[in-house]
Amino acid sequence: MSSVAAEAVQQRRSGFRERLDSLTAPSGLFIAAVLVIMALPVTRTIQDPDFWWHLRAGQLIIQHAGLLGSDPFTYTVANHHWTMHEWLNEVLFAVEFAVGGLGLIVLVLCTVTWLGLLAIMQKARLRHPGRGALGIGMLVAVIAGFPIWGPRVQMITFAFAALTLLLVERHLVKGGKAIWGLIPVFLVWSNFHSGFVIGLGFIALVLIAEVIGGWLHMPDPAPRERLRPLLFVLIASTAVSMINPNGPTILLYALGTQTSGAQQSLIEEWFSPSFHDWEVLVYGAMLLSLAMLTVFNRHIRARDVALVLVTTALSLQSARHIALFVAASTPVYIDQLALASPRMRAALRRLRRAPAPARTRARGQPPLLFRLTACTLLIAGLAGVYVAWLLPKMQLQPDSLAYAQEFPVCAAQWLAGAPEPLKIFNQYGEGGYLAYTLSPHGDKVFIFGDAALMGDPLLYTYAGVETVTPSWDASIRRAGTDIVLYDINTPLADVMAHAADWTKVYQDGLSVAFVPTDKLSTVHLPPVPVWPPGSVCARQAKAAPNTGAQNQ
């Protein structure tokens, strides 16, 4: 018995030593470096204009101890029913903000995004690619997703989608009971974001692809006996997703977004990616190289074909869906890269007319202590770089200069001093920040970023004003607007600056405000501010030192 125990101990020691050797080998250090480097592009300041109204909505949910049945932010669609499909995420935003400010929210969302990337890497590892292909593929994917990374609600769906695909692939490859873990995942996901229907769609797509792939005798099909549990998981996950304050209607909510002509044609994040933008070029290169690798290898699984084709179509339709392309297609890209590597090396040798490398005696590795020290120093150095990259993002406050250059921070500070609530016609992407800062004062905005709540008619009305159609003035006045706050150097601002029946009352380096001339005596505004030298707004206002504003 003692000899058996000693042998078991020896095997454990041997296995531990092998893992250490593997982790401290050059390829292991490369993967460790990739894991840290992946965190850099996804760690950014808050750039999503919708973040601010999500935060305020979460504060109101806590304040009212329940979901909001109608719109609290606008004076245009206050009677519309509000389907708060992101209520749990909004509540967490409010709690995190109360505990740790914006810094904690940035940290949590960036960590969630990194965990989604880790799930993608784990799915790719199920096919045992070389570490070179794994690391290179992940780096390409992270750069390809650069246009959409950052602290935003959609990263929750990205991470859950990556986790769903990992568990599905693990089940098809290895079997086991882990697939049933998707049921609680969808219970939570459906209360975080309506994007959970994407996860359900991925499972259904894999099931259909495997059935069709079996008929077509495509390579590496999943065992048929593993498809039935996956079908049961899909049914159960669909059922538990309806355990939600919105009930079964949550399943239909996302379809309204996908079928809205106004949202698809008017909202920038729903536009197709522009390949004239340098940020999109790596995504395009990844897409093109994936197609070339697939043709070169002539070997791809049915479920991989389905996932790549569907997410490619979605990402070409809308830039925001590049995240889904990265989640679904990166493991396929890595697999194709690994399949192509030996053939590409052989082809290069033939071009050089060089013989295959002769087998040589393996060189001994440096001592383990040396390798552990090098590994520790590398990881510590990269971690230090990441912390130096992260901390400035976490330290920014809502009224910092970085945000004042993107959002109407200074104009909101000015309007907050108004003695009475105002009805503000605003830029679509700035409605969220204005709702966050001014709704506690009773001010209302014309529009903000929940396009489904706004409805297509209001979106088209706003688009008509933004593009200065002949009815722009009537549309603003008909809504009962008190003041227009818009970005400088835009068509609307330029037209209003030359309109006799509109008076400019405020301007800073980002925004300009106008009041109908016939309302100057009835709209009570705060005095034009004089910002202290060196303040955030003084530095921002240097772009427009002479406002020419009139304020009664």
Give the ranges of each region predicted by the language model:
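Membrane-proximal, lumen/periplasm-facing interface regions of secretory-pathway glyco-
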Residues: 348-417, 429-431, 442, 451, ...
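Transmembrane-helix motifs of polytopic, lipid-linked glycan transferases
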Residues: 107-127
